[in-house]
């Protein structure tokens, strides 16, 4: 069993923020793979389903970004999962918009959701980095991250989320390189 976590902030006012692209990824995966109903558990929203042959739990912490680790830690302990079962989908400033990269472990790069998970569980988990691009100057980062995707970006956003969901079985079985390559190919074809 695997636990896939999408990072974001709860509430409709945050739903379309770049910072919530992790939530968006999980919502798309749940829809494409016909996951079960949403349950309120572990200080978040949990859905159960299968991706390929793997049982996968999707968790969106409802704790706000800075406390995501509380929710994730609670779920990991309840299901007695090792760190190799944890996959975290998050927005990444230092990646071009709509690029997808998988990375094992590492630092938090100033991301408060990753910092919280690191604090509660340690750094050794798989990250699916979802590029939102950098606004160019550090003074504009907060407004960029907490801003909505522009109308002109919607097609690229939908293409990225759809590609992630379509290729999710590769991620579930640990074929991270093919997962990334196939997403990039789908995006080139869509563009």
Swiss-Prot record:
Keyword Ligase included in the entry's annotation: no
Positions that bind tRNA: 14, 64, 66, 112
Site location (Discriminates between blocked and unblocked aminoacyl-tRNA): 9
GO-annotated cellular components: cytoplasm
CDD domains: PTH
UniProt-listed Pfam families: Pept_tRNA_hydro (PF01195)
Compartments it resides in: Cytoplasm
Catalytic activity: an N-acyl-L-alpha-aminoacyl-tRNA + H2O = an N-acyl-L-amino acid + a tRNA + H(+)
Domain of life assignment: Bacteria
Catalytic-site annotation from UniProt: 19
Molecular-function GO terms, alphabetical: peptidyl-tRNA hydrolase activity; tRNA binding
This enzyme's EC code(s): 3.1.1.29
Site positions (Stabilizes the basic form of H active site to accept a proton): 91
Family note: Belongs to the PTH family.
Record's function text: Hydrolyzes ribosome-free peptidyl-tRNAs (with 1 or more amino acids incorporated), which drop off the ribosome during protein synthesis, or as a result of ribosome stalling. Catalyzes the release of premature peptidyl moieties from peptidyl-tRNA molecules trapped in stalled 50S ribosomal subunits, and thus maintains levels of free tRNAs and 50S ribosomes.
UniProt name for this protein: Peptidyl-tRNA hydrolase
Protein's gene: pth
